[in-house]
Regions:
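Non-heme Fe(II) oxygenase catalytic core, chiefly the N-lobe of the double-stranded beta-helix
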Residues: 2-210
Length: 210
């Protein structure tokens, strides 16, 4: 039986006892999947996981998304994004967002593995967009229900290219903007699996609201 410790009333659960060095059986995979649907974000503390095991775990949820159009990848694993922040490459994202909403098909989930973390700071924060919707007054729910948002690669366009960017990074951004263009999505949507209503817009990728 899967051991899940609830973190907050709205979001988050810690799962213990998973050994990523061995294949995860189907029953455990299914339990993790349903824990993710229930808690929306789940954590595996002090888990030792290789890039190969990372991909194998991702495949247990379905087909892995194509390589990220902008960020570099882990050597030998093009489907794993490598994010490295230091004094030369400071963080370029500091805004609430849902990953890749500019794509035609939004990914089901993202799996993050922290390899090196600072003693202070460096936090990644999560929020529940369904809990945020539930707390809106009824007149605001009705108002937002008639609106749509146009999503594009705005955050990358605005923050990824800087004076220190290479010609290669600028070209990758250019190619990705042409490739993905824009996608129009309702501000309020229902999750296709859980049926929960949630807010699907964010300052990182929404160009404007119509």
């Amino acid at each position: 039986m899967l051991n899940v410790k609830k973190i907050t009333p709205a979001i988050g659960g810690i799962i213990q006892g998973i050994n990523f060095s061995k294949p995860i059986d189907e029953a455990t995979q299914d339990a993790i999947y349903h824990a993710l649907l229930e808690h929306k974000v789940i954590f595996f503390r002090n888990a030792a996981i290789t890039p190969a095991a990372h991909l194998a775990f991702a495949r247990s949820f379905g087909v892995i998304d194509e390589p990220h159009p902008i960020y570099p990848h882990v050597d030998g694993y093009e489907n794993i994004v490598k994010l490295e922040n230091n004094e030369k490459t400071p963080p370029d994202t500091n805004a609430w967002h849902t990953d890749l909403t500019f794509k035609q098909h939004q990914p089901f989930a993202s799996i993050l593995v922290a390899r090196t973390v600072p003693d202070i700071g460096g936090d990644t924060l999560w929020s529940s967009s369904s809990a945020a919707y539930d707390r809106l007054p009824e007149h605001m729910k009705a108002y937002l229900g008639d609106l749509e948002a146009i999503h594009d690669m705005g955050d990358f366009r605005n923050n990824f290219v800087s004076d220190t960017s290479t010609e290669d990074s600028r070209q990758r951004l250019n190619d990705a903007i042409v490739r993905f263009g824009q996608n129009v999505r309702p501000l309020i949507q229902k999750h296709p699996i859980t049926g929960q209503t949630f807010l699907n817009f964010n300052e990182a990728f929404v160009n404007h609201i119509v």
